[in-house]
């Protein structure tokens, strides 16, 4: 049986602008898990998920309690792994004919000298109106940036260098478990074991995981059903197949597609195996080449 790493887009957990309630997340997860359950019957499946809204909520709750010093961001990322991993595991385990589902708290090494620490640009937390920027920055000391028509907090997002728990993940996969891991891009730690005040991009973490466990494929699921040429124009066209070199211009694109293209291209170049970008609702069609974008050499 082949091994597949699947990175879930944020819409699998929470729709943009939705309240960060457990009820909303369970409802979105319930829509996502049937397709994942079908995949789990055909592949050894490792599932990576984002945590941007959730870790931002934890940070807000953390700041609201004035009696103790706020917990660092790496601890909050670990908390979000437990929260989201539990919700996904509960929902997946309820599907018929599911193998055992296991959530692994995953640490990922980053460099303390990564230039990302000097230029935070990873969005976390809920969306705000632009007119709230000055008050939020003054109250919390946050850095804020535009995310579409909204405003969101940004934090450092260093490059993942090594998944410290990959051997355990690989062992569980070989034993037939569906493994939820590297949640929120993994808990960022430095070589000396210290936690790091950052959030790693989950797509880059998924690509690194696929490399380290020698997966047979990497799937990055997103709101868009493919990578598009001339996006947002009357001439837009879905790209069904491309090489990493052909997709290189898209890696520099603004928005969320750039890191996804960077992630899949790096994996394909490193391992020579295929990767896909597509919509969760069409994941089986994407793997069959009937939807999404397939990236290969």
Curated annotation (Swiss-Prot):
The keyword Lipid metabolism does not apply. This is Carbamate kinase. GO terms for cellular component: cytosol. GO terms for molecular function: ATP binding; carbamate kinase activity. It catalyses: hydrogencarbonate + NH4(+) + ATP = carbamoyl phosphate + ADP + H2O + H(+); carbamate + ATP = carbamoyl phosphate + ADP; hydrogencarbonate + NH4(+) = carbamate + H2O + H(+). Kinase involved in the anaerobic nitrogen utilization via the assimilation of allantoin. Catalyzes the transfer of a phosphate group from carbamoyl phosphate to ADP to produce ATP and leave carbamate, which spontaneously hydrolyzes to ammonia and hydrogencarbonate. It holds the Pfam family AA_kinase. CDD domains: AAK_CK. GO terms for biological process: arginine deiminase pathway. Its EC number is 2.7.2.2. InterPro entries: AceGlu_kinase-like_sf, Asp/Glu/Uridylate_kinase, Carb_kinase. Keywords: ATP-binding, Cytoplasm, Kinase, Nucleotide-binding, Transferase. SUPFAM superfamilies: Carbamate kinase-like. NCBIfam families: arcC (TIGR00746), PRK09411.1 (NF006926), PRK12354.1 (NF009008). Belongs to the carbamate kinase family. It is found in: Cytoplasm. Pathway: Nitrogen metabolism; (S)-allantoin degradation.
